[in-house]
Amino acid sequence: MIVLGLETSCDETGLALYDSELGLRGQVLYSQIKLHAEYGGVVPELASRDHVRKLIPLMNQLLEQSGVKKQEIDAVAYTRGPGLMGALMTGALFGRTLAFSLNKPAIGVHHMEGHMLAPLLSSQPPEFPFVALLVSGGHTQLMVVHGIGQYELLGESIDDAAGEAFDKVAKMMNLPYPGGPNIAKLALSGDPLAFEFPRPMLHQGLDFSFSGLKTAVSVQLKKLNGENRDADIAASFQEAIVDTLVKKSVKALKQTGLKRLVIAGGVSANLRLREQLETSLARIKAQVYYAEPALCTDNGAMIAFAGYQRLKAGQHDGLAVTTTPRWPMTELTIPE
């Protein structure tokens, strides 16, 4: 089965072809970073308009790159949610229309399920069950993954997601968009122990809270009164986030008795986080798994793969086009 995956939940237009026999046949990705940079963040209307402009050219590029003919596509998977309504709708309409024209099934995929299953595309995928740390601009969650659609929520952020905190602190520091990678880059030349920022809720279950940390950074920046300590601020802030994510992940593994941790979402690309996770998990003889670097950020491959998992179980959508900007993963059903 060859599945076309479409990702348009935010500011990346990603398309990919997943072949159940040959694996990933090809993928293309267009990022809108330059478009939104002058605004310091994603402008939803501009994002959806740019998806409209890019979908057909990228589709043609993907078919040429992969050597697959449009008529060979067996099904279409598109991101149904969560995400920006207009951006989601462009991908959903494109995908559902294409599937209808080819007389093929289509299915809407949960964006974070795509991220969480992306490590299964690697050469050494994790086996079920495992603990998943989903960490992105919109999500910070710990879950036990028993199988496709079998997700048990252990804890989540009660306010800002980790990626959102990165972006907001970057804005406070007048760093360019996207904030997370720029903070990580600046942190390389800073001292992570220079400022003692809080680790909210560190010893309170498996939920997260990052709004207090964000406020602490704001207060410290005002105290500096123009003194340039940006590298130290970035390093200390990043260390607080990483320390919290690592310790909660270790706690989740101990609590569940599992020895496999999958980390997924845009923040999973953070090198300091990976370094600290590997060190901490080695101490408890546990293993950490990531998606391939190209599959850490938003992409069509993860949607194609997640869609395939549900399509092969017989799931597909009707003719109605549905998008769900707010969609808890705990609402997902088990394929039958």
UniProtKB/Swiss-Prot annotation:
Residues annotated for substrate binding in this entry: L134, V135, S136, G137, G138, D167, G180, N270
Subcellular location: Cytoplasm
Pfam families: TsaD
Known cofactor(s): Fe(2+)
Enzyme class: transferase
Its EC number(s): 2.3.1.234
InterPro entries membership: ATPase_NBD (IPR043129), Gcp-like_dom (IPR000905), KAE1/TsaD (IPR017861), Peptidase_M22_CS (IPR017860), TsaD (IPR022450)
Entries under PROSITE patterns matching the protein: GLYCOPROTEASE
Residues that bind Fe cation: H111, H115, D298
Cofactor note: Binds 1 Fe(2+) ion per subunit.
Predominant location: cytoplasm
GO process terms (BP): tRNA threonylcarbamoyladenosine modification
Protein origin, superkingdom: Bacteria
Described function: Required for the formation of a threonylcarbamoyl group on adenosine at position 37 (t(6)A37) in tRNAs that read codons beginning with adenine. Is involved in the transfer of the threonylcarbamoyl moiety of threonylcarbamoyl-AMP (TC-AMP) to the N6 group of A37, together with TsaE and TsaB. TsaD likely plays a direct catalytic role in this reaction.
NCBIfam families: gcp_kae1, T6A_TsaD_YgjD
Family that this chain belongs to: Belongs to the KAE1 / TsaD family.
The protein, known as: tRNA N6-adenosine threonylcarbamoyltransferase
Protein source organism: Acinetobacter baumannii (strain SDF)
Annotated gene: tsaD
